Amino acid sequence: MKEETGNLVIDQKIVDLYRQIDTIINSKEEIKKSRYEGKLNISAKTQKVLEDIDDNHNYSLAMGIIRKNRKNLNRNALSYRGTKISYEKLFEMVYTYANSLKNTGFKKGMQVPVFGENTPEFIALYLATNLIGCELLSLGEWFDKDYTEFLLNKSGSKYVFVSDSVYDVIKDKLDDSKIETVVLMNLGSSLPKDKSGKNYNPYAEIDDRFNHDFSDKSERIKTESKKEVLKIEEFLDDSMSDDIVCNMSLDDPAMISFTSGTTSPGVPKAVLHANRSYLTLSRFKDKDISGLASMDGKSVLCHIPVYTHMELATISDALYQGCELCLEPFYDRKFFKYSIVMYKPNYSPGSEGSYLDLCKNLNDNPEFKNVTLKDFVAMCITGEGLTPGSEKYINYTARKHKFGTHAAPRPISPITASIGGGTSENSGVFTTLFKSLREKFSFRNEPFGLIALPFAEVAVLDDEGHYCK
């Protein structure tokens, strides 16, 4: 059902979604309060932003993203192997997923376990879980068997959502857990459709080189699993409800991500995030706060595993800023170059090894001889800081292949995000951002181009927010 609003014809689900959100926002108008005055050693501007978040953004991350894009409904939100999904269509999906979760028995505070990939189905599930007040438990297929079973059993959930591309790896873990129903998400469900209505992959020639499998595995899995197995299409309920959006606060738990697991192989540390964590990260990237160029309408490659905070934050930040997510379900250093060329994103996080492989192929592989990346404005290197030699080589390649020159007069040097003692995540408190200042340094006596910037003040606070030992 469609409803005409101004010059737009909007799906009834979207109208109902914003009606429920507006009702919750109006109910919060009388309970604004500041918590920060005189308690933290922070700048006046930072304090003002934190007060604004408390006063005007005291809700779930999903509500924040949906509110922020109220005027962007016709804009592309997701790109997936040639399929384009608008913000309106994405929010319709979120509505359907949220309603289906609630009708299945999920309530505020419950955990929704997921073994996902970067697909439209995962994005919809991510936002829907948060919208109804549940906690996303985003798991990796490589986690230790006993650890996986512990997390699944502790979640209390009867359901687990699984990308069928990883099912075979976790089958025994699921079979031996207390989970009752496995809901499968197929990598091929959101591929473009041909004239006969069948899904097809316009990049099949490239994917086939890497044995990437988009086929529907549900019938085989249904015969092999000890659990009830549903396809995501069988799980979804397309009805409507007056009670989908949960009235959450900033400090309500929202999602659980995991570190790389290098300390104890197979047993990565879990990190519980409140709505405040992701909304604060996103709000501080707004142009009026950061002073940086707006991300509005830019495209971001999402290819890092979705159990990491870095990827969940990349997704939430980009959607909050009205960006287009370029979804890549395969995290592979050797495939990264093809993801960049296929999607031509404006921004992408990636490991040093991924970027060096991209640069080597751009410079030496005849297949990439004529490739220019004029839309590729920002490179973010995850993990430890770049060596001077690596940075020099990446900068050389960026100049040669004209990275980002549609938006900037010359290529921008890579930005590096790392943790002391960690790899590829920014979920810890010991986070340092490295920002290229484009200043001239002596190549002989000191590193060049990267200057450390403090990202967070580390302090011990009591329950009232005062400093203590």
Residue ranges, per PLM feature:
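N-lobe entry segment of adenylate-forming
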Residues: 1-85, 89-104, 108, 132, ...
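Adenylate-forming
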Residues: 68, 90, 94-97, 101, ...
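Conserved AMP-binding/adenylate-forming
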Residues: 83-84, 98-146, 301-305
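Conserved AMP-binding A3 loop
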Residues: 86-88, 245-247, 254-280
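ATP-dependent adenylate-forming carboxylate-activation enzymes
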Residues: 116-117, 134-150, 164-166, 303-304, ...
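Gly/Ser/Thr-rich phosphate-binding loop
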Residues: 230, 346-350, 362-443, 454-457, ...
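Conserved AMP-binding/adenylation subdomain of ANL enzymes
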Residues: 279-299, 307-349, 360-362, 455-457
